Amino acid sequence: MAEHIFTLEAEGDEHIWRQMNVHLHLYSYDAEGNACGVVSANNDTSHKSGKKLSVCTPKPTAEAAICLYVVPKGLPESDRVSDSPPLKLTLRVLRDGQVIDSMKRQVNQFGGDQLINVRYK
């Protein structure tokens, strides 16, 4: 089975970075499906560059799984749902530098968002 470098990117405007804690996790698996590592980033670390947060596998791997957790830092400016539209976040998964998946997430300002164990080969 071929091995690849996987990258997980999250991109959004300044509102999501100011109002949410964004956590990315990228898990590595060998050809037999055994876990062999995890790398993480959040918007409180030096991984954040402007409007983008990213993390990549440190060495080639047969398979990768992604997890996203978006947790509110506090309550929205208004307690009215109609005044607090979802925040937009774009996730991209790259394999050897080429985009293999892209998702547009609508992040609830009151409850956040999560995406768990989506796998790529």
Task: Report residues per predicted region.
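Mature extracytoplasmic domains of secretory-pathway proteins
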Residues: 30-82
